[in-house]
Amino acid sequence: MRNPYFDWIPFKAAKGEILTVRFDRPLVPRSVHRGIWMAPTEDPAVYRVGSTYDWKHLDQRTTLEARGELETKLLSFIKLPFAVENHEAAVRPIIQESKALLGLHPANERLGYFNGLGSKGSLHAPWFAACFRDYLVHGSPLPSGCDLRKNF
């Protein structure tokens, strides 16, 4: 799971489980983050819901415990019936400080890095992408909090 070009960036692995759920009717197509995230799909009645964090069991097996956790959290803010259509698990890298990192490799400027968004940060992905674009195309500075070269 280590990237040989960016192996100096500290991260840890976590297993996460997500659900694909179908509601009885279409919902307003927007992403929500309330302890878990809920993101729309092409079908306005179907959403992806996640994610759990398991730091010990780094496998791709789904668990009833994680499914129950996600269903309970979803029901805490969406008071509508839903059916679980799919349940998936995967191991993902988590930037240790849970922050976005952008920039070019210090020794090879042909290698770019755009990572660390996480579920909350993904809501800001368009802004981070615009910052990275301006950095690459116009030479604009990256925000200091996410500049790869200033943080490591």
Regions found by a protein language model. Name each.
Residues A83-F152:
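C-terminal catalytic lobe of FAD-dependent flavoproteins
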Residues M1-E109:
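Active-site substrate-recognition segment that forms the wall
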